[in-house]
């Protein structure tokens, strides 16, 4: 029997995911970062779901592009970062660090995780140990720092590392295969200051290959595994993080 509360992934564009939290008991749903409305509406209607809320992590168009159409179709509230009021005028409620949000059966705590953007937030669900992290962290990688500093990017990852090891991270891009190639470049460099668990990385690579061959997502990520293989989580200080991020930017 299907779980009462679960997360479904709706692929959009080339490598984005929209996350649809679904409550089987009430047929209510919550959408996280719907960059495109059409596939989300199709999924909701096919599964006879009513959209109860939209959660946004940051203002980039591939995360908010479908909000207006979805809000008009389902008349649901939109939650967004307080620091992005100008960029996301369609939102109804503005969120900051430590705020609590209840949507249907789900309770979330808001975490401000700047770096990728200055106003970036994530949504933490304690009950299921779910983190909806936007573009802060990816499988074996992290988001580019378009607005924030290296210090902010590093500290945001340190905050994620403090979550329970069983945390499931729902990041919104399928970048894991590309990031694996970067990890292997690091492994083959004699002078790299960051090395992870090579055996764990190969197990990770095998699992990733198996999933992608079946057209299955690499998301959600398991925090306990990312901590042993993700070079950006293994960085011991801001300077190591800067080294990695600048190297990755050149790839």
Swiss-Prot record:
InterPro entries reported in the protein's UniProt record: Clx_II_MBL, Glyoxalase_II_hydrolase, HAGH_C, Hydroxyacylglutathione_Hdrlase, Metallo-B-lactamas, RibonucZ/Hydroxyglut_hydro
SUPFAM superfamilies: Metallo-hydrolase/oxidoreductase
UniProt-annotated binding residues for Zn(2+) 1: 58, 60, 116, 135
EC number, UniProt record: 3.1.2.6
Keyword Ion transport listed: no
One GO-annotated biological process of the protein: methylglyoxal catabolic process to D-lactate via S-lactoyl-glutathione
UniProt keyword Amino-acid biosynthesis present: no
Residue positions binding Zn(2+) 2: 62-63, 135, 173
Record note on cofactor: Binds 2 Zn(2+) ions per subunit.
Reaction catalysed by this enzyme: an S-(2-hydroxyacyl)glutathione + H2O = a 2-hydroxy carboxylate + glutathione + H(+)
Keyword terms of this UniProt record: Hydrolase, Metal-binding, Zinc
Entry GO MF terms: hydroxyacylglutathione hydrolase activity; metal ion binding
The family this protein is said to belong to: Belongs to the metallo-beta-lactamase superfamily. Glyoxalase II family.
Self-association state and partner proteins as the record states: Monomer.
PANTHER family: HYDROXYACYLGLUTATHIONE HYDROLASE, HYDROXYACYLGLUTATHIONE HYDROLASE GLOB
Listed HAMAP family: Glyoxalase_2
NCBIfam families registered for this protein in UniProt: GSH_gloB
Name by which UniProt lists this protein: Hydroxyacylglutathione hydrolase
Lineage per the UniProt record: Bacteria, Pseudomonadati, Bdellovibrionota, Bdellovibrionia, Bdellovibrionales
């Amino acid at each position: 029997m299907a779980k009462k509360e679960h997360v479904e992934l709706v692929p959009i564009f080339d490598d984005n995911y929209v996350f649809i939290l679904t409550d089987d008991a009430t047929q209510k749903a919550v959408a996280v970062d719907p960059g495109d409305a059409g596939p989300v509406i199709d999924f909701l209607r096919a599964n006879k779901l009513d959209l109860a809320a939209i959660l946004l992590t940051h203002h980039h168009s591939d995360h908010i592009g479908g909000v207006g159409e979805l809000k008009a179709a389902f008349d649901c509230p939109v939650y967004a970062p307080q620091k992005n009021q100008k960029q996301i005028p369609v939102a109804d409620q503005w969120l900051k660090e430590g705020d609590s949000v209840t949507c249907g059966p789900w309770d979330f705590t808001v975490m401000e995780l700047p770096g990728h953007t200055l106003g970036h937030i994530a949504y933490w669900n304690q009950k299921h140990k779910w983190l909806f992290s936007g573009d802060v962290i990816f499988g074996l990688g992290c988001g580019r720092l378009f607005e924030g500093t290296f210090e902010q990017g590093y500290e945001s990852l340190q905050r994620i590392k403090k979550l329970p090891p069983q945390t499931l991270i729902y990041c919104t891009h399928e970048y894991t295969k590309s990031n694996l190639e970067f990890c292997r470049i690091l492994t083959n460099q004699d002078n790299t200051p960051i090395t992870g668990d090579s055996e764990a990385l190969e197990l990770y690579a095998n699992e990733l290959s198996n999933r992608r061959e079946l057209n299955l997502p690499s998301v959600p990520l398991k925090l306990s595994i990312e901590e042993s293989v993700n070079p950006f989580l293994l960085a011991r200080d801001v300077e190591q993080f800067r080294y990695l991020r600048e190297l990755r930017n050149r790839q």
